[in-house]
Amino acid sequence: MKVSLEGFSVAIPAYSRVKEFEELLVSIYDMSFLPNEIVICEDGSKERKELSAIGSQWKSKFQEKNCNLIFIENEINLGYDANVRKLIEVSSFKWVVLIGNDDLFLKDGLSILKEFTDRNENISMVSRPFIRFSDDINKPLGFSTIDSKENIYSNSNKSSSKMIFRSCGFVGGLVINRNWALPLATKKYDGSLYYQIYLACNAFCTNGIGYLKSPTVGGRTGNPPLFGSAESESEIHIPGAYSAKGRAKMWKSVLEISQDIGTKYKVDIYKDLKKELMVKQSFHVFEMNVGVGVRELKELKSELKKIELFNHIVPKFLFTINYFFGRNALIFYRLIRKIAQ
């Protein structure tokens, strides 16, 4: 096992999205404090040559700022979970900052993070608020946060395990303590698209998940998911959309992970996580399914019922809204988001 050096690795699981990939590199270059290295694992997309060329163009620019850019071409399509695991493994520095290849860093993102990790050097993971944007980060759609103050979520702090999903469901800007994560590496949950939730469940039961007060990244909305090309994903997931079966598979995996890790540490993290998925997170899923056909909507309902996540009044109400109002239901979701801001 390669020993971790003190410092930061920015880790990018790259797949297609050439334009967004270069925008991400620009955002890293423009930060007030740069990482020690940028590690990119390209997972066999059709745009590999273009992505590699952009990486080569930026390598010398980052070297001038003492930041090493490493572009790795995976021999086979590993899929999301295995690619994240590989990024953690091949990184050289203690703090591995994951970011999707269509998200962006904010100017002081890494400075804010460094100040926190300097004070919490044994923390297992770090999460963050983030700005939601579509095409232009200077025209944000909103601000996503789960806490008004800096915090550490853990079983020892008597936090609710619902904070595991709230803090780590979105991968952009999540920080992994590489020394802590390497011994936990497993292929068991490949295809779940939630390797970070596996790590977060472990973090919650051990040294905790830190949460920053200020945002460090921008999370892009609107791009379709590209999961489904790897062998571990192709049976369920379809590139370009979250199908009902795909979403149910993801949430079923979260429940299985929480049961496994809860048993490992003798901590009940399953109950609150299940309620979190059934109530708060169902809002996001039904919002994403505004305007879909009745058949797709009924399939979503059926899949949620199979994993017992349709028993609460909230998913039933949201299903009804989508069923009767179709695309006009978007007005309801926008109103709720505006009130919640």
Question: Which ranges hold each PLM region?
Answer:
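N-proximal low-complexity "stem/linker" segments adjacent to membrane-targeting elements
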Residues: 1-30
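Acidic donor-binding segment of Leloir-type glycosyltransferases
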Residues: 25-72, 76
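Glycine-rich, basic loop-to-helix element that forms the pyrophosphate-binding segment
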Residues: 74-91
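Short aromatic/hydrophobic "clamp" motif used to bind/position activated sugar donors
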Residues: 96
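The conserved acidic donor/metal-binding loop of glycosyltransferases
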Residues: 100-104
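Conserved donor NDP-sugar-binding/catalytic core segment of glycosyltransferases
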Residues: 108-143
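Conserved nucleotide-sugar donor-binding catalytic segment
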Residues: 153-237
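C-terminal subregions of glycosyltransferases and related glycan-biosynthesis enzymes
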Residues: 198, 215-341
